[in-house]
Every structure is written in C-alpha cells, then in structure tokens.
Design a protein with these regions (language model features):
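Glycine-rich, acidic/polar active-site loops that bind/position phosphate-bearing ligands
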Residues: 1-193
Length: 193
C-alpha cells in the first residue's frame, strides 16, 4: 500500500484510466505506461483512497461542481527547471556539500574554447548560440505534443545559468495534474539523453 493505509486496512486496487495509456518513448522494449486511481477494497463497492493525490484532485473537482462554485477549474502551471553539464554531491563525517556546473555560466568565462558565455542573470529569453539547450527543450516539447499535451512555449529563465521554463496551454485541473506527471517524466528523461 506504499504507506497510504494501516496494515489492518491495506487491501487496495489500482483502477487504470485507459485515457492516460501511452507507449513509453524511453524504453527500448515497448512498455505501456498508464495512470489510474488507487481504491480501497470495500463492501459493497470500492471507494477512492482519500490520500491518493489523483483522487484528491477528482474529489475537489466534484466538490466544486456539487457546491455550484464552478463547472470546471482551469490552471496553467509553469515548469521551471535546471539542466547542468555537471552535478555532484558529497557527504563526509565532517561536511556535506554539492556542486553544479553549466558551460554557458558566467563563471566559466575564462575557460578556453567556450566563447558563448551568458553574463550573470542575463539568461532570460537568450537565443542561440548562447542558448545551448534549445534543441533539447524543443525535443521535450515535441515529445509532449506527441502525447497530446499542448505547449505554449519554452525559453531560458532569468535566474542562474541552466534555468529554463516550459509552459503548457491552459487546462482542466485533473487533466493538468496528469499532464504534470508526464511533463516532469519527459523533462527528466530527455535531459538524461
């Protein structure tokens, strides 16, 4: 039950939502990926597990309708993330630390051969050749659109070097919650390539 319920009442079932089924583009062997609802096995019928995030969103949408607050809720998250050329961490008995590096970062301006280094906090909407990850982000967006997730745009962000944003189109709350999982999955796996 993954910690959602006490052992004495832990019988659950996963009900797939066939509308979310897709072939995983990152698996060499064809693999079906699907989202669904976690249900507590109960009599006379199963009931939604009230701690499961997807069920919480669906219950919130139903509550909104039942109370005549609105028929639907549209949301628009922005997915901001970093892509680094190097990232590391260390834990020793007397210290803990991490380090990150991005070739286009201003602190690499003295390195030979880089040429296109972005000044501190001047990343916002930079173009090629300064934007070294344009192709990667475009690939992310194309993969998302193949899955039916419409993308408004993507661009470098103003913050630290290697900070980016992908913004989907406005969407219904429960659909956007499902899309959020897929967007994060696509960002992570495309960046890993």
């Amino acid at each position: 039950n993954y910690g959602y319920a006490v052992v004495e009442k832990s019988d659950m079932v996963f009900i797939p939502d066939l509308d979310t089924a897709m072939i995983d583009p990152y698996c060499e062997i064809p693999t079906l990926s699907i989202t669904g609802n976690a249900m507590v096995i109960d009599y006379p019928e199963n009931r939604p597990l009230d701690q499961y995030p997807r069920n919480i969103v669906l219950a919130a949408e139903q509550y909104m309708k039942d109370c005549d607050i609105a028929d639907t809720m549209l949301i628009l998250p922005e997915f901001e993330f970093h892509m680094f050329d190097q990232a590391g961490w260390s834990v020793t008995p007397d210290s803990i630390g991490f380090s990150v590096d991005c070739e286009q970062a201003y602190w690499n301006s003295a390195n030979q051969g880089l040429g296109c280094v972005v000044p501190h906090q001047k990343n916002y909407h930079i173009a090629k050749p300064f934007d070294r990850t344009y192709e990667c982000r475009s690939e992310m967006c194309l993969e998302l659109e193949k899955m039916g997730i419409e993308i408004k745009y993507h661009h470098p962000e103003v913050g630290a070097a290697g900070q980016f944003e992908i913004e989907p189109m406005l969407g219904q709350m429960s659909k956007m919650a499902d899309n959020t999982m897929m967007i994060k999955y696509i960002i992570h796996n495309t960046a890993l390539k």
